[in-house]
Amino acid sequence: MTERQAVILGAGMAGMACARILSRRGIDALLVAPPSDVASRGETLSFRAGPYLETLGWHGLLDAETALVNQGSYSVWGNRALRRGMFHQEEMSGWHIDRYRLEARMAETLEADGVDRVFCEARQFSRSETGIAVELADGSPVNTRLLVDCSGRSAVTAGPAVTLRRLDKLVACYSVFTLDEDVEAIPVTLVEAVAIGWWYTSLLPGSRMLVGLFTDSDLLPAGFRKNAGLWADLASQTTAISPRLSSLGMDLAAAPELHFAAASTVTASELVEPFIIRAGDAASALDPLAANGLATALWSGIQAAESVVGLLTQNDGTKAVQYQQQFLQGIASHLAVQTAMYASEHRFIDAPFWQRRRGPWLEN
């Protein structure tokens, strides 16, 4: 049976950040995650991620192939006027990223660091007085002192003692388009509120455009999942999204493929418990409207790693306790901002999507 000081489940940004720090601190850690099969997608990486990327030595991975500097955010929210910025927040430059490619670059640095990885899932866990036994999907067992769960929204270590609380049914319906060679698009983010939810567009590296509709899964029109024409029809009714797409020569009805991804707010009842620390979406997956999820993933991966170091080298759980407190405070702050964001849209107060978001979230 293999013995490891730490096992990390999941190779998203939180898991890889955790693995990077543990490797640098001389901790014998094993990264457990199957090969990524996520469809090509793009996301916004908040300026808040900058210091974490520097800490990890990853800031240099942001280049023309992986990231575009965001040149501004625009919104139609609260009324039909197009305005610069979102919800009176201070606007600072972030990045529009090709997440798949950026994470592949991050994985290459871990390989260069000598981080061990097995490309399969963890199937079963059993706790003892000294740690956790992990049974991998290939049948091999691993014993570890500490387990860091970065497995995403599934939070595979959750169970009867640690539950996942979902606050909504938000889902992202999106597609990525390749723009014609003669099209020049400015890398800006555009968000527009509509009765069924909200639209989002963002330019990606490689002259590609991501277009997404965020709504609740039970509010999707019948047949929506197999009919891009319905998606295009909804977009045609927007104030700013439709003109933006038309100016770029885009036809949503000709979407190469329509993808669906869970985007609901889900939080584990415990972020830290004996022998287990949760990070990234396994700790808390938050509404993407605030565009801060990836920065939080990097931060939590770093802090989870520092918690592991404290526990393993000094038998000191102080950092783990502080990590959980800071994360919970961040969740509460996010939910307060989230409630204010949705409350600032008054045009659709009778629509189910908006009625569900009148708050307070923790009492829903």
What do the PLM-derived regions correspond to, one by one?
Residues S23-R41:
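Glycine-rich FAD pyrophosphate-binding loop
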Residues M1-G12:
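Beta1/beta-strand and adjacent pyrophosphate-binding region of the FAD-binding site
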Residues E306-N364:
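C-terminal helical "tail/cap" subdomain of flavin- and related membrane-associated enzymes
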Residues T109-R244:
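Predominantly flavin-linked oxidoreductase catalytic cores and closely associated redox partners
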Residues H88-E108, P221-K226:
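Short beta-strand to alpha-helix junction loop
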Residues A39-Y74:
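N-terminal FAD cofactor-binding segment of flavoenzymes
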Residues P141, F224-A304, T313, A320:
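FAD/FMN-dependent oxidoreductases across multiple families
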Residues G15:
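N-terminal Rossmann-fold NAD(P) dinucleotide-binding loop
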